[in-house]
């Protein structure tokens, strides 16, 4: 089951055909919705806001001056460029491109705080959704293009219009496209992928190869248009804090932080770590919001379909923005603000350091920064003005959802048109604001070099960013000594940071300036210095900076230490290795610092291990985590002799055994996945590394006996047991079969059961498959465990025949095999497998899923039993989905699904491929050792990818091990769930999902 509230479209808004007939009989039309909740004038709408105490909200522009604003950017006091997403929600996916998009230039010429003049800067554009200033013009995202527009004659209309990049996917709906161009400290313009991608080229540089833009965000050079992928996968929202840390958002994920870029992970091709993003805020069902409007606004004209209003969760997080102005109070500076358009509010969260990353939470529960009772209020974008105030774009429309996500027969009931002629922009300031000193100081004087440099010292982030951009554009070397003074002496750390990056943009950042910044009293400035030092060190030009960078591994700030690891990872100097070892012992429990350190040890793993062993003992958990990852790196990339030595050393070590088990597990996992290891037939990885004689040694036998005992020890820590169970999967079935079979028992913790299944699959012995599919065992499996078993039995050819036999014998029913797995088996390379699959699945592969939906829909009007619905959820859905904290994490958390109409829920249970979000589409992978895996891509790097499987686990696969990778476009959720329960239980299931408790 999949709720649209949890996917990158919007929430699904279906209404049932029975109600459709009833409403048509009563002459209900879409206009009735609007009449029941009419639009308010701009003045009336202001009265409906609930704003945080001590602040006030002011209208600065409204229709007809501005229509459907989706993004804006100030190019100076009283001048505002606005991207107008006119025509939204047109076009329906696949129906072609709109040309209704426009860019408006608004001006406040009389200085009264409201814009009164509009120039049509550009018209006849596609769906525009982002703006960025550069050299007197603006970059505009309007998939499939990024354009550059400029007014060269001063009439307020762009007469220069150039496509600088093209090839971005424009086949999906408007909210799933490249967006949010944002100038970073480094002078590059960053964009979100919109959860789609493309093949990006520049018409101005036809000789360049196309850049595959997929599952990543990106950036480009504003002068050369060179485009590259970056980490992250944002939908509509991208922001930087004052120290250049990048954050983004996506519907159910309000705040995420980029921790590692592709270049960092590419330094060590043997590091099987593909994550790059930290969830900063709470997500999905835990990401609470507190609307004061009706949260179920999309269907609130059919009260019988909706449960009572309640405090909801983020379903449409967008426009994430870190505020750096003085127009609010000091406590608001550095806070992150997120729009939630579906529920008519803006949430504020406070950022706090947490290890190398950040976390964020609302300052208080139960009340939002800004909310409205007006269901037409649709905040989508936030920004800061030259006056230090927070500005907000409100699309102001009846429906924010896209009709693509509404069943065709129900679209006529919803009013997607009202609001196409409306839009508002607001300013939020302190209730008793003071005029911005910067506004008065710098207005109309930005062509003066000295004044522009002075703006770097502004307390407002807008002026600091404006000054940096103008100085870099101007490229006047006369500014260099002035900027160097600010870098050394400015009171604000934010100003010193901007000055450093301005010097970098002017190609005038010197080693002494970097060295001084490495000793700056503020950790944010030291981070910047380490970035610059790392660039020089990697080029072999940073010898003078190396001692200070090494000293930074002992810094009192965790993020500075993390940045030091990234900086030193590019050095080949032997003095770096002990520093990295000491750092990872101190911060080994922080996964980002651990990954940063291990990214830099390619080619010197033996030296790193020796340095690590010289370090004093630290927390066992930290050492275990480090040793497992180090073992993986050894196994994947070291010579066979080095791997053998590493393994023998760990087997013969004395003392604490948990880190030994972790290290050995990492080594054999890494070795088994390496290219050319030839372990497809040799399933005993210990024998593959040590040879037959070494495998038969007493040391190995004793160690494996201990591992088997630890795996079954109910008193041991769960993490230690899981490592031991996984390690059994690298021995052989004769030794490990019996203990693994015992771990399938219902009395064992679920994680242990699933790990035992994976270990049996790794052994690859048909006897393991037979053990998994024994009638008595199968009957006692929970849904999660069944999913794990089915994933195992379809992963290797040797096990598939046993599964077929079990289906034929009635132990397993055919509908329990998902559509993705059925397709995999029906297209298998082995003709025997294909033929048996065709025989077994023939009855399931035909038929019209929408007809099934139409057949079941009338059941929704019958009496239901919520308790039986809960039983149906636990039996059928909980293996993959979490609901109120119960269940798996294969698919989205569906706790918030109760806000949807009943037949919308039914539709996506019965027709799971009705709409599949890009990040939940199934990938099918075949590896060099013959494994077949299906799942969705959880993360990827240059050298590996991580697959979230239907069994609920994650599999990291080195790209070098891929034989094939195919995206099916299908959901992992199977067709035919109705065949697993009685008809009335389907209605009971829907009732449970919509219930209060």
Where are these regions (language model features)?
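Bacterial N-terminal signal peptides
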Residues: 15-27
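Sequence context surrounding c-type heme c attachment/ligation sites in exported
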Residues: 402, 424-425, 838, 845-846, ...
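Long, ordered, helix-rich scaffold segments
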Residues: 393, 415-421, 429-872, 890, ...
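Beta-propeller domains with acidic blade repeats across secreted/periplasmic ectodomains
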Residues: 30-451, 470-472, 885-886, 959-960, ...
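Bacterial N-terminal signal peptides that target proteins for export
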Residues: 2-17
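Axial heme c-ligation environment in periplasmic c-type cytochrome domains
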Residues: 788-790, 794, 808-829, 888-895, ...
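C-terminal capping alpha-helices of c-type cytochrome domains
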Residues: 60, 80, 136-138, 144, ...
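C-type cytochrome heme c attachment motif
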Residues: 318-319, 388-389, 423-424, 482, ...
């Amino acid at each position: 089951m999949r709720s649209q509230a949890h996917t990158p479209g919007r929430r699904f808004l279906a209404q049932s055909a029975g109600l459709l007939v009833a409403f048509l009989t009563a002459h209900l039309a879409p206009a009735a919705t609007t009449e029941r909740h009419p639009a308010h004038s701009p003045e009336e709408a202001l009265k409906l806001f609930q704003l945080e105490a001590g602040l006030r909200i002011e209208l600065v522009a409204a229709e007809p001056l501005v229509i459907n604003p989706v993004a804006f950017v100030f190019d100076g006091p009283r001048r505002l460029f606005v991207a107008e997403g006119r025509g939204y929600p047109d076009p329906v996916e696949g129906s072609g491109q709109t040309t209704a998009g426009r860019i408006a230039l608004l001006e406040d010429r009389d200085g009264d705080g409201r814009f009164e003049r509009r120039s049509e800067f550009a018209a006849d554009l596609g769906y525009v959704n982002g703006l960025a200033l550069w050299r007197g013009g603006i970059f505009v995202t309007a998939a499939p293009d990024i354009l550059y527009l400029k007014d060269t004659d001063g009439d307020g209309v762009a007469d220069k219009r150039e496509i600088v990049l093209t090839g971005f996917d424009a086949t999906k709906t408007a909210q799933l496209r490249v967006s949010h161009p944002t100038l970073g400290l480094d002078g590059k313009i960053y964009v979100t992928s919109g959860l789609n991608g493309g093949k990006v080229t520049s018409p101005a540089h036809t000789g360049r190869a196309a850049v595959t833009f997929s599952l990543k965000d990106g950036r480009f050079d504003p002068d050369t248009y060179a485009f590259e992928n970056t980490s992250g996968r944002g939908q509509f929202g991208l922001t930087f804090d004052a120290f250049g840390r990048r954050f983004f958002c996506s519907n159910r994920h309000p705040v995420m932080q980029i921790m590692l870029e592709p270049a960092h992970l590419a330094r060590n091709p043997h590091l099987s770590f593909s994550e790059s993003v930290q969830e900063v805020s709470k997500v999905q069902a835990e990401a609470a919001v507190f609307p004061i409007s009706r949260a179920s606004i999309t269907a609130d004209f059919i009260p019988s379909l909706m449960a009572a209003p309640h405090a909801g969760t983020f379903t449409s997080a967008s426009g994430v923005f870190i505020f750096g102005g003085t127009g609010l109070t000091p406590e608001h500076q550095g806070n992150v603000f997120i729009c939630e358009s579906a529920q008519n509010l803006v949430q504020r969260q406070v950022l706090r350091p947490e290890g190398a990353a950040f976390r964020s939470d609302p300052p208080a529960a139960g009340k939002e920064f800004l909310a409205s009772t007006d269901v037409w209020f649709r905040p989508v974008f936030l920004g800061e003005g030259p006056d230090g105030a927070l500005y907000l774009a409100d699309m102001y429309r009846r429906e924010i959802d896209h009709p693509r996500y509404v069943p065709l027969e129900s679209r006529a009931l919803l009013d997607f048109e009202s609001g196409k002629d409306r839009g508002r922009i607001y300013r939020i300031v302190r209730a008793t604001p003071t005029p911005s000193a910067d506004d008065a100081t710098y207005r109309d004087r930005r062509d003066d070099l000295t004044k522009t440099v002075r703006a770097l010292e502004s307390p407002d982030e807008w002026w600091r960013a404006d000054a940096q951009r103008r100085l870099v554009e101007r490229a006047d070397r006369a500014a260099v000594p002035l900027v160097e003074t600010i870098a050394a002496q400015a009171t604000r750390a934010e100003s010193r940071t901007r000055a450093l990056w301005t010097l970098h943009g002017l190609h005038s950042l010197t080693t002494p300036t970097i060295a001084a910044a490495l000793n700056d009293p503020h950790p944010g400035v030291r981070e910047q210095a380490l970035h610059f030092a790392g660039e020089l060190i990697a080029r072999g030009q940073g010898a003078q900076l190396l001692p200070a960078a090494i000293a930074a591994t002992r810094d009192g700030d965790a993020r500075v230490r993390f940045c030091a690891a990234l900086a030193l990872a590019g050095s080949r100097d032997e003095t770096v290795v002990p520093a990295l070892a000491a750092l990872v012992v101190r911060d080994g429990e922080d996964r980002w610092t651990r990954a940063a350190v291990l990214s830099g040890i390619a080619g010197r793993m033996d030296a790193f291990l020796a340095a690590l062993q010289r370090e004093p003992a630290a927390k066992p958990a930290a050492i275990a985590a480090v040793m497992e990852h180090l073992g993986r790196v050894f196994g994947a990339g070291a010579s066979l002799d080095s791997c053998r030595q590493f393994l023998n050393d760990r087997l013969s070590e004395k003392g604490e055994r948990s880190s030994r088990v972790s290290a050995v597990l990492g080594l054999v996992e890494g070795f088994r996945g390496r290219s050319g290891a030839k372990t497809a037939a040799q399933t005993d990885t210990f024998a593959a590394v040590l040879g037959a004689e070494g495998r038969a040694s007493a040391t190995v036998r004793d160690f494996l006996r201990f591992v088997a005992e630890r795996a079954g020890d109910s008193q041991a820590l769960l993490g230690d047991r899981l490592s031991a169970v996984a390690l059994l999967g690298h021995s052989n079935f004769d030794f490990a079969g019996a203990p693994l079979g015992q771990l399938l028992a219902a009395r064992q913790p679920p994680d242990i059961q699933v790990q035992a299944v994976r270990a049996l699959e790794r052994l690859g012995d048909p006897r393991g498959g037979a053990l998994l599919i024994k009638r008595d065992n199968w009957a006692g499996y929970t849904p999660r465990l069944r999913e794990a078993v089915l994933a195992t039995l379809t992963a290797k050819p040797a096990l598939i025949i046993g599964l077929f036999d079990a289906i034929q014998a009635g132990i397993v029913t055919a509908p329990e095999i998902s559509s993705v797995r059925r397709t995999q088996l029906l297209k298998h390379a082995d003709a025997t497998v294909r033929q048996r699959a065709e025989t077994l699945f023939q009855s399931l592969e035909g038929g019209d899923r929408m007809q099934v939906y139409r057949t079941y829909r009338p059941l929704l009007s019958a009496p239901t039993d919520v308790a039986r619905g809960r039983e149906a959820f636990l039996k059928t859905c909980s293996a993959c989905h979490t609901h109120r904290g119960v269940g798996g994490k294969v698919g989205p958390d569906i706790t918030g699904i109760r806000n949807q109409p009943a037949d919308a829920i039914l539709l996506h249970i019965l027709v799971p491929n009705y709409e599949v979000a890009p990040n939940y589409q199934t990938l099918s992978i075949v590896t060099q050792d013959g494994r077949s895996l299906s799942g969705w891509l959880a993360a990827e790097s240059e050298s590996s990818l991580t697959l979230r499987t239907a069994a609920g686990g994650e599999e990291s696969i080195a790209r070098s091990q891929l034989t094939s990778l195919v995206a099916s476009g299908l959901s992992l959720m199977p067709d035919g769930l109705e065949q697993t329960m009685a008809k009335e239980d389907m209605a009971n299931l829907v009732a449970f999902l919509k219930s209060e408790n």
